[in-house]
Amino acid sequence: RFRRLCPKVDVDLRMVDHALEPFELLQSGKTDVIFASRQKEPKCEWIPLYHELLYAILPKQYPLNGRKEFPLREFEGKDFLMPYGRFDIDVHAAFAKEGVRAKEQSVYVDDETVIRMVGKGLGISMMSELMIRGNTDDVLCIPVTPKSIRELGMGTEKGVELSESVRRLKECVVEYTSCLHGRTF
């Protein structure tokens, strides 16, 4: 839709190495718009777009005993494979609410590899629903309790008048995401 509304506007999409990098790029003027997970105090105009649950990623043989949720406290003392890319910010926020201290191992591999490592019994992990979609054949993925969410959104520079093309992009994204079925808590 945006391409139809603004056919002469180039959109440059970038992957970043960690969760704080989009905010750094925005603050340094290297980008006009970011899509990211909300951080404690985003120093930008922030528009919430989607809320996603955090899930425990467990080996298939993990003894759940019929439970449909995984208590955050059960991560305590367990070998925990920490996903790469500063996702630890979201994990630590969830752990802090319950005072959990897992035996964290930082792993510098992609999410799919972390899931495979869990499937091989090398530890357990926690990821958001968008991180695990389609990669769950060898593991159990169940929501953590108490419910923990991560807010995805769009940011623009604070206090700056948006260009016509950025304003239109913002409108298109808000309209598109309004029909997604994110979580409301």
Regions found by a protein language model. Name each.
Residues 45-55, 106, 125, 129-130, ...:
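Short beta-strand->loop
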Residues 37-39, 60, 128-131, 152, ...:
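Short secondary-structure boundary segments
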Residues 3, 45-48, 64, 71-73, ...:
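Short secondary-structure boundary/capping segments
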Residues 17-30, 86-140:
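Hydrophobic hinge/microswitch elements
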